[in-house]
């Protein structure tokens, strides 16, 4: 009998040891799994960050995948020149060359079929080229804060000769610059520094926020994207609302949300390149009338940073990790994401009592 008991005890001890081992392995695996939630107002650069993760942590875009973006590049280019030409009427800007009025009519006649077919035919690219070279069109482009225009407009239009080639294949940079509105939730997986990342890009959900926000209670960190350059723009869906104010409102609701009490908040003040260019001729007082500093990059950017960080109501227990980013610059995103990962590792160790 004694032998039987000791054999059973031995088996139970083995089982207990195995359970402990499995629990430890599960715990280690869970500690290595990082759920990242990408949030921010529309057109703040969230999807570009996701594309950068594919370039940096996977193998980038294959030639075939790049080809599939050709129609998007054409559509973005056509939509951009159309937006500028349409705005000329509203802003009462004339073409410098009266012949461009015919080109404008041609643009609207040809663009619909071209977009449907995902093409950029020679006659249409010629029309776009002549319009873009017109001084009146350029004058209207310089006033783009007064209407809705893609950030990538000048990038594509200045490179029309290249993208209009019959054998054109988009580059990784062309793909990064494409704009497709995100609807629903896009999930991306990758491994970095022995961590398994799951990144969720939540887009197009302005009115439904209350319904889905609690689903992300267990996320490791939130990356909140803000377009610095949007300080003098209004929303596409609400022309009364300044885009920066909308961003601040959203950040306030996320940063101080009960579901995210223990979640690291990482703030990406994005589009720093566009902001640096714009701040010299479009004053920050458009967005913040109380601002008395210089319209220079460093001072104005620091002011915006403090406006966002001041929204944190739990400063004593919650830190905001802020980075200035240019989502289309792979090296910059790589450097920043490296720093972000170190923060996540440090916080994970802290949670496990190892730091």
Swiss-Prot record:
It is found in: Cytoplasm; Cytoplasm, Cytoskeleton, Microtubule organizing center, Centrosome; Cell membrane; Membrane. Residues 266-273 are annotated as: G4 motif. Keywords: Cell cycle, Cell division, Cell membrane, Cytoplasm, Cytoskeleton, GTP-binding, Lipoprotein, Magnesium, Membrane, Metal-binding, Myristate, Nucleotide-binding, Palmitate, Transducer. Residues 35-48 are annotated as: G1 motif. The keyword Cell membrane applies. A lipid is attached at residue 3 (S-palmitoyl cysteine). It is a lipid-anchor. A lipid is attached at residue 2 (N-myristoyl glycine). GO terms for molecular function: G protein-coupled receptor binding; G-protein beta/gamma-subunit complex binding; GTP binding; GTPase activity; metal ion binding. Mg(2+) binds at residues 47, 182. GTP binds at residues 40-47, 176-182, 201-205, 270-273, 327. Residues 325-330 are annotated as: G5 motif. Ubiquitously expressed. Most abundant in the lung and in the spleen. GO terms for biological process: adenylate cyclase-inhibiting G protein-coupled receptor signaling pathway; cell division; cell population proliferation; G protein-coupled acetylcholine receptor signaling pathway; G protein-coupled adenosine receptor signaling pathway; gamma-aminobutyric acid signaling pathway; modulation of chemical synaptic transmission; positive regulation of cell population proliferation. One of its GO terms (cellular component) is ciliary basal body. Gene3D superfamilies: GI Alpha 1, domain 2-like, P-loop containing nucleotide triphosphate hydrolases. Belongs to the G-alpha family. G(i/o/t/z) subfamily. G proteins are composed of 3 units; alpha, beta and gamma. The alpha chain contains the guanine nucleotide binding site. In this context, interacts with GNB2. Interacts with UNC5B. Interacts with GPSM1. Interacts with RGS12 and RGS14. Interacts (inactive GDP-bound form) with NUCB1 (via GBA motif); the interaction leads to activation of GNAI3. Interacts (inactive GDP-bound form) with CCDC88C/DAPLE (via GBA motif). Interacts (inactive GDP-bound form) with CCDC8A/GIV (via GBA motif). Guanine nucleotide-binding proteins (G proteins) are involved as modulators or transducers in various transmembrane signaling systems. The G(i) proteins are involved in hormonal regulation of adenylate cyclase: they inhibit the cyclase in response to beta-adrenergic stimuli. May play a role in cell division. This is Guanine nucleotide-binding protein G(i) subunit alpha-2. It comes from Cavia porcellus. The lineage of its organism: Eukaryota, Metazoa, Chordata, Craniata, Vertebrata.
């Amino acid at each position: 009998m004694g032998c039987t008991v000791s054999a059973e005890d031995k088996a139970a001890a083995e089982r207990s040891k195995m359970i402990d081992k499995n629990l430890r392995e599960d715990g280690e695996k869970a500690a290595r799994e990082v759920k990242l939630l990408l949030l921010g107002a529309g057109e703040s650069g969230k999807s570009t960050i996701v594309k950068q993760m594919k370039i940096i942590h996977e193998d980038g875009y294959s030639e075939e995948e790049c080809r599939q973006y050709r129609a998007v590049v054409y559509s973005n280019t056509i939509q951009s020149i159309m937006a500028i030409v349409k705005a000329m009427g509203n802003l009462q800007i004339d073409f410098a060359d009266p012949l461009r009025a015919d080109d404008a009519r041609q643009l609207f006649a040809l663009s619909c079929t071209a977009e449907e077919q995902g093409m950029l035919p020679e006659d249409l690219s010629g029309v776009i080229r002549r319009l873009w070279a017109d001084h009146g069109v350029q004058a209207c482009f310089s006033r783009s804060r007064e209407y809705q225009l893609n950030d990538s407009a000048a990038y594509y239009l200045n490179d029309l000769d290249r993208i209009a080639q019959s054998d054109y294949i988009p580059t990784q940079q062309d793909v990064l610059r494409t704009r497709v509105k995100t609807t629903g939730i896009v999930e991306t997986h990758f491994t970095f520094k022995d961590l398994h990342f799951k990144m969720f890009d939540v887009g197009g959900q302005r009115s439904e926020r209350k319904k889905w926000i609690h689903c992300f209670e267990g996320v490791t960190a939130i990356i909140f994207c803000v377009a610095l350059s949007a300080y003098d723009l209004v929303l596409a869906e609400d022309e009364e609302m300044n885009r920066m104010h909308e961003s601040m409102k959203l950040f306030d609701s996320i940063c101080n949300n009960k579901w995210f009490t223990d979640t690291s908040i990482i703030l990406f003040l994005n589009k720093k390149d566009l902001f640096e260019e714009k701040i010299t001729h479009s004053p920050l007082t458009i967005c913040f009338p109380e601002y008395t500093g210089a319209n220079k990059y460093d001072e104005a950017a620091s002011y915006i940073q403090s406006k966002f960080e001041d929204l944190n109501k739990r400063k004593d227990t919650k830190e905001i990790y802020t980075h200035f980013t240019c989502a289309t610059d792979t090296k910059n995103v790589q450097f920043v994401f490296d720093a972000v990962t170190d923060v996540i590792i440090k916080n994970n160790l802290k949670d496990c009592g190892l730091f």
